[in-house]
Curated annotation (Swiss-Prot):
InterPro entries: Ribosomal_uL5 (IPR002132), Ribosomal_uL5_bac-type (IPR020930), Ribosomal_uL5_C (IPR031309), Ribosomal_uL5_CS (IPR020929), Ribosomal_uL5_dom_sf (IPR022803), Ribosomal_uL5_N (IPR031310). Pfam families: Ribosomal_L5, Ribosomal_L5_C. One of its GO terms (molecular function) is tRNA binding. The keyword Glycoprotein does not apply. Keywords: Ribonucleoprotein, Ribosomal protein, RNA-binding, rRNA-binding, tRNA-binding. It comes from the Bacteria. The lineage of its organism: Bacteria, Pseudomonadati, Pseudomonadota, Betaproteobacteria, Nitrosomonadales. SUPFAM superfamilies: RL5-like (SSF55282). This is Large ribosomal subunit protein uL5. Belongs to the universal ribosomal protein uL5 family. The keyword Ribonucleoprotein applies.
Length: 179
């Protein structure tokens, strides 16, 4: 079992029940899924760019990536309906906790000029979005073998009803929030 999953069951649940006074253990917020999304607008001109982006995302997540396609045509961006414009991976259960562990302990500390992650990136429904500017913060990506620096969006979906509960949950997992 993943280290953070054990930590959640043993420590985080008790801590959140004390803090918010839940009547049942099932009321305690938990992380439902983590979605990694990489928008690759340059893929319209060059198909190789998309292949490299998918390969990078698969290395980071340890799971097969799905190519996302444009929902409608936009002339300004030279995109037609059905063109590949990005890729995504949805992590759940064990893979999710293992990725979260790597993100907190290894990847986030490798961000240049890091001063903590923004506490303002909650969506009002208990979900958190984190933008990463360079995929090289993940140890799975070898700096010499990348063709371009690409950013990605990490969405952490929780069962929390409010942002306050979600922040308490992520803080319990030792997320380095800015004060």
């Amino acid at each position: 079992m993943a280290r953070l999953k054990d930590f959640y069951k043993d420590t985080v649940v008790k801590q959140l029940v004390e803090q918010f006074g839940y009547k049942s253990v099932m009321e305690v917020p938990r992380i439902e899924k983590i979605t990694l999304n990489m928008g690759v607008g340059e893929a319209v001109a060059d198909k190789k760019v998309m292949e490299n982006a998918v390969a990078d995302l698969e290395k980071i997540a340890g799971q097969k990536a799905v190519v996302t396609k444009a929902k409608k045509s936009i002339a300004g961006f030279k995109i037609r309906d059905g063109y590949p414009v990005g890729c995504k991976v949805t992590l759940r259960r064990e893979h999710m906790y293992e990725f979260l562990d790597r993100l907190i302990t290894v990847a986030i500390p490798r961000i240049r000029d890091f001063r903590g992650i923004s506490p303002k990136s909650f969506d009002g429904r208990g979900n958190y979005n984190l933008g990463v500017r360079e995929q090289i913060i993940f140890p799975e990506i070898e700096y010499d073998k990348i063709d371009a620096l690409r950013g990605l969006n990490i969405t952490i979906t929780t069962t929390a009803k409010t942002d306050e509960e979600a922040r308490a949950l992520l803080s319990a997992f030792s997320f380095p929030f800015r004060n």
